[in-house]
Design a protein with these regions (language model features):
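Short, Gly/Pro- and small/polar-rich lid/capping loops
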Residues: 2-16
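A low-complexity, Ser/Thr/Gly/Pro-enriched, surface-exposed linker/loop concept
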Residues: 5-7, 32-71
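Short, hydrophobic/aromatic-rich segments at coil-to-beta transitions
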Residues: 13-21, 71-75
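Catalytic and substrate-binding clefts that recognize carbohydrates or anionic sugar/phosphate headgroups
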Residues: 68-200, 207-208, 220-221
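Acidic-and-aromatic substrate-binding clefts and catalytic sites of carbohydrate-active enzymes
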Residues: 208-214
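Catalytic domains of carbohydrate-active enzymes, especially glycoside hydrolases
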Residues: 215-225
Length: 225
């Protein structure tokens, strides 16, 4: 008997609009916004439409972009960026590039290290001194990468599974210095983090004062009001 996990099922919209996707050889590009592009590479063209542990929503509105081919190079152009890929090739710094069309006019070649502004730390437990932060999605250079290649995929019954192959699955955030829009679209892609309702936290009160019993009673009555 197969177990179901209804309570663990996430609401996802993982399949992108067909008109936002471009396939060139073993690569599939999904233009989620004019500044956010998903890049997939799989030699067998086994591309993934399922949600992952990181990415829940790819059903973005139709994007405005053009596609052209010249001398074996596929070019995707939006108002904000130009992506070039040498069709039929593996992903290397010579075969794939993304360039901003506006300031700071950064060009990123696949595999190059990106100096990010970093993100957050999950916990400060056991930390005494400096802490290396996790990668974020903002950069002074204007281009960052979210690599989703190693995350598990979500199944229809609310469980997880491994990917069928060691494919490349990453997202290019080309937002320049518009950090607010970058983070907003990151949450559109991954979903808003769930928050505990305020009532579940109870009353939090901290004050260095020697309360009497009556003062505690008065304080609780204030909270009730």
């Amino acid at each position: 008997m197969q177990m179901t996990y209804e309570r663990f099922k996430w609401k996802t919209e993982s399949k992108a609009l067909p008109q936002n996707t471009v396939t060139a050889g073993s690569c599939r590009f999904t233009v989620l916004t004019e500044r956010l592009i998903r890049i997939e590479y799989d030699s067998a063209q086994r591309f993934t439409d399922e949600a992952s542990q990181v990415v829940f929503h790819r059903n973005f509105p139709e994007s405005c972009f053009t596609v052209s081919e010249c001398d074996g190079v596929t070019e995707i152009k939006t108002e904000y960026l130009t992506l070039k890929y040498k069709a039929g090739s593996c992903l290397t710094k010579e075969t794939l590039s993304v360039e901003l069309r506006q300031a700071p006019s950064t060009k990123w070649n696949f595999g190059e290290e990106i100096r990010q502004l970093k993100g957050t730390a999950c916990t400060l437990d056991g930390i005494n001194g400096a802490l290396e932060l996790e990668d974020g999605v903002c950069s002074r250079g204007g281009i960052t990468i979210l690599d989703d290649s190693c995350s598990l995929l979500l199944t229809e019954d609310g469980w997880f599974k491994n990917r069928e192959s060691e494919e490349t699955d990453c997202y290019v955030f080309a937002y320049g210095h518009d950090y607010k829009s970058c983070i907003a679209d990151f949450y559109r892609l991954t979903g808003i983090p769930p928050l505990l309702p305020a009532y579940a936290l109870g009353n939090w009160w901290s004050r260095y004062h020697r309360y009497t019993q009556q003062e505690y009673c008065d304080l609780i009555e204030r909270f009730q009001k």
